[in-house]
Amino acid sequence: MDQEAVGNVVLLAIVTLISVVQNAFFAHKVELESKAQSGRSFQRTGTLAFERVYTANQNCVDAYPTFLVVLWTAGLLCSQVPAAFAGLMYLFVRQKYFVGYLGERTQSTPGYIFGKRIILFLFLMSLAGILNHYLIFFFGSDFENYIRTITTTISPLLLIP
């Protein structure tokens, strides 16, 4: 594969692989809690602790395809570095949500809200990339440098709670 092409997606691939490891960690937590309660077989119902782990995992799994789509779309069509940074932030927030959900449910709320904001940022980056493509196609105007500067400048603002 061409090194330039790999360089354009390597950060996105790293974030994706980290997210796969995180999914495996969440699934392992569900498995451990299931075995602790019922022995060998996996059960979908059980103790309150199992219900919380299972529900937290399910909530993370439900949002995962959306995260992957906006991460890769933003990274490919707009700018890889801010998209990868936002992706890493989303993974930290998802971890906070998962761990918070295992405690009191109010502890998971900041992670949930912060995660929505990061998904929105990635979605807006994707839209900017698509809009830029059509501006080039129809009018010959390329705003890629402006969009890249704006997204690179705004992405650290995701750290503000």
Swiss-Prot record:
Annotated keywords: Endoplasmic reticulum, Leukotriene biosynthesis, Membrane, Nucleus, Transmembrane, Transmembrane helix
User: What are the recorded GO MF terms, alphabetically?
Assistant: arachidonate binding; enzyme activator activity; enzyme binding; glutathione peroxidase activity; glutathione transferase activity; identical protein binding; leukotriene-C4 synthase activity; protein-containing complex binding
The main location is nucleus
One Pfam family this chain carries?
MAPEG
In terms of InterPro entries, this protein maps to: 5_LipOase_AP, FLAP/GST2/LTC4S_CS, MAPEG, MAPEG-like_dom_sf, Membr-assoc_MAPEG
Taxonomically, the superkingdom here is Eukaryota
Q: Name one GO cellular component term.
A: endoplasmic reticulum
Q: Which residues lie on this side of the membrane: Cytoplasmic?
A: 31-52, 103-107
* One of the GO BP terms on file: leukotriene biosynthetic process
Which SUPFAM superfamilies does the record match to this protein?
Answer: MAPEG domain-like
Membrane topology annotation: Multi-pass membrane protein
Which segments sit in the membrane without spanning it? 108-115
Lumenal side stretches? 1-8, 78-80, 129-161
Cellular localisation: Nucleus membrane; Endoplasmic reticulum membrane
Transmembrane intervals: 9-30, 53-77, 81-102, 116-128
Subunit: Homotrimer. Interacts with LTC4S and ALOX5.
Functional note: Required for leukotriene biosynthesis by ALOX5 (5-lipoxygenase). Anchors ALOX5 to the membrane. Binds arachidonic acid, and could play an essential role in the transfer of arachidonic acid to ALOX5. Binds to MK-886, a compound that blocks the biosynthesis of leukotrienes.
Domain remarks in the Swiss-Prot or TrEMBL record: The C-terminal part after residue 140 is mostly disordered.
Q: Which family does it belong to?
A: Belongs to the MAPEG family.
- What's this protein's name? Arachidonate 5-lipoxygenase-activating protein
Lineage of origin: Eukaryota, Metazoa, Chordata, Craniata, Vertebrata
